[in-house]
C-alpha cells in the first residue's frame, strides 16, 4: 500500500502556511512535506505537526542564502541550490547547518540537497568535484542526527542548466560520494521526461536500497 505525503507548498494554498497542516490532517494525510520551512519558527511548525498527528518526511536545503530573508530572495531570483557551485562552500555549510537544525526540531529524517544551475563560466568537472565534496560533507554532518541526504535528478525542460538530470548520473555520484546516508530521490515525473521508460530504472535501482 503506497503512502502519500501532502506537499504543503502546493496544496491548500488558499490557507496561510501554518493552517495547511490541519487541512492535510482533515483530508486523511499522515505525512507532509514542503519546499522550505525557513520563514517560520521551527517550534511553530513542530506544534502543528504534533497537534495534527503528522509526520514531516521531507524538505529542501536552502537554494542559497543563510537566513529566512536571503533564502526567500534567492528562490525568487532563480537560485536552485549551490551544492555544485565552486566558491560557495561556506554558504553551503551554513545553509546545511540551518537545515539540520530545522530537521532535528521537526524530527524529519530526509533532506533534499538541491544541486544548482551550472553557469557557462563553470566547467562540468569543477561542478562535479564541488558537488561530490559538498554531498560528502552533508552526509557526514547529517549522519550524526540519523538523517538521510537525498539527491534528485531534475529534468532540463523545467529547469534548464540544472546539474543533475539522469538516474545513471545520480547513482554514479553516489559511488564517488561514498556515504551510506546519501541516497537518490527518484521522481518519476522528471525521470519520464528525461529517460522515457521509467520501468527500466525502477527495476535497475530500486533493489539497490539507494532510492
Predicted segments — roles?
Residues 1-104, 175, 179, 183, ...:
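N-terminal pre-domain/capping segments
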Residues 10-12, 38, 62-65, 115-119, ...:
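Active-site-proximal loop/turn and secondary-structure-junction residues that shape catalytic pockets
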Residues 22, 48-49, 128, 166-168, ...:
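Glycine-rich, phosphate-binding/catalytic loops in enzymes
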Residues 31, 150-153, 185-188, 192:
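Generic enzyme active-site microenvironment
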Residues 32-33, 111, 149, 211:
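Hydrophobic residues within beta-strands of alpha/beta enzymes
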Residues 45-53, 134-142, 201:
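Catalytic-core regions built around general acid/base machinery
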Residues 78-183:
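Active-site acidic/histidine proton-transfer and metal-coordination neighborhood
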Residues 194-202:
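Histidine/acidic-residue-rich catalytic or RNA/ligand-binding cores of hydrolases
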Amino acid at each position: 500500500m503506497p503512502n502519500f505525503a501532502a506537499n504543503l507548498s502546493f496544496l491548500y494554498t488558499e490557507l496561510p502556511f501554518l493552517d495547511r497542516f490541519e487541512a492535510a490532517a482533515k483530508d486523511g494525510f499522515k505525512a507532509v512535506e514542503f519546499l522550505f520551512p525557513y520563514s517560520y519558527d521551527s517550534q511553530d511548525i513542530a506544534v502543528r505537526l504534533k497537534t495534527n498527528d503528522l509526520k514531516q518526511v521531507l524538505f529542501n536545503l536552502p537554494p542559497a542564502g543563510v537566513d529566512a530573508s536571503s533564502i526567500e530572495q534567492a528562490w525568487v531570483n532563480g537560485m536552485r541550490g549551490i551544492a555544485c557551485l565552486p566558491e560557495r562552500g561556506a554558504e553551503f555549510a551554513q545553509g546545511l547547518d540551518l537545515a539540520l537544525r530545522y530537521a532535528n526540531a521537526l524530527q524529519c529524517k530526509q533532506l533534499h540537497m538541491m544541486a544548482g544551475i551550472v553557469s557557462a563560466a563553470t566547467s562540468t568537472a569543477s561542478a562535479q568535484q564541488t558537488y561530490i565534496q559538498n554531498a560528502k560533507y552533508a552526509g557526514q554532518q547529517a549522519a550524526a542526527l540519523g538523517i538521510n541526504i537525498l539527491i534528485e535528478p531534475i529534468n532540463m525542460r523545467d529547469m534548464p542548466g540544472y546539474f543533475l538530470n539522469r538516474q545513471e548520473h545520480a547513482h554514479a555520484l553516489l559511488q564517488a560520494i561514498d556515504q551510506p546516508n546519501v541516497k537518490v530521490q527518484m521522481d518519476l515525473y522528471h525521470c519520464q521526461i528525461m529517460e522515457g521508460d521509467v520501468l527500466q530504472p525502477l527495476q535497475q535501482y530500486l533493489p539497490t536500497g539507494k532510492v
